[in-house]
Swiss-Prot record:
The lineage of its organism: Bacteria, Bacillati, Bacillota, Bacilli, Bacillales. GO terms for molecular function: metallochaperone activity; unfolded protein binding. This is Probable nitrate reductase molybdenum cofactor assembly chaperone NarJ. InterPro entries: DMSO/NO3_reduct_chaperone (IPR020945), NO3_reductase_chaperone_NarJ (IPR003765), TorD-like_sf (IPR036411). It is found in: Cytoplasm. Chaperone required for proper molybdenum cofactor insertion and final assembly of the membrane-bound respiratory nitrate reductase. Its main location: cytoplasm. The gene is narJ. Keywords: Chaperone, Cytoplasm, Nitrate assimilation. It comes from Bacillus subtilis (strain 168).
Length: 184
């Protein structure tokens, strides 16, 4: 995956996994045009399929699905360190480590979200050097896989985006790390 494809893929995933409000809908045509440029056919087609699927929902129904899936679902939230430690003290250390990693890479995250919020992590992956993105996602690959599995079990339309993410991570050479594995 070349740099441009990586940046478009991770940026698009960050957007598409964000809250689907009016602003989100207004940006979709621009994202669709950018996604058309992705060289990897599988990733491009799955992202475009998500547009078709999400368009079959009314704006209100899509928001309801999003909120039910990510905001009310403890097992399907997008805070990837939550799978390891929930609200435990150890999570704070992981969050601080992530924030420091971002800053060391020149990425200054917003204070509106915790550093382990998946769309924010995807923004980082789009902006950072590939080695830094790889390092962050290697630690949490099992968490991303677990989230994808849970979304699939819930028949969420967002499962497809997580499968795109897993394919993109594999494409940039992300391999499993024991350190960040989901605890059974």
């Amino acid at each position: 995956m070349n740099t441009t494809d990586r940046q478009i893929t991770f940026s698009a995933l960050s957007c598409l996994l964000s809250y689907p409000d009016e602003e989100w809908r207004a940006e979709l045509p621009d994202w669709k045009a950018l996604i058309q440029e992705i060289g990897n056919r599988q990733i491009r087609e799955k992202l475009l399929h998500f547009f078709e699927t999400s368009a079959s929902y009314s704006p209100e129904a899509l928001i309801e699905h999003y909120v039910y899936t990510f905001d009310f679902g403890k097992k399907t939230n997008m805070y990837v360190t939550y799978f390891n430690s929930g609200e435990q003290r150890e999570r704070g250390i992981e969050l601080l480590h992530l924030k420091n990693t971002y800053e060391q890479s020149g990425f200054l995250p917003t204070e509106k979200e915790l550093p382990d919020y998946l769309p924010l992590m995807l923004e980082f992956a789009a902006a950072a050097e590939i080695e830094a993105a790889r390092s962050v996602f290697e630690k949490y690959l099992s968490n991303v896989r677990e989230l994808a599995s849970r979304l699939e079990k819930n028949d969420s339309i967002y499962a497809e985006l997580l499968h795109v993410l897993l394919a993109a991570l594999e494409n940039i050479g992300v391999r499993e790390s024991v350190e960040g594995a989901v605890q059974a």
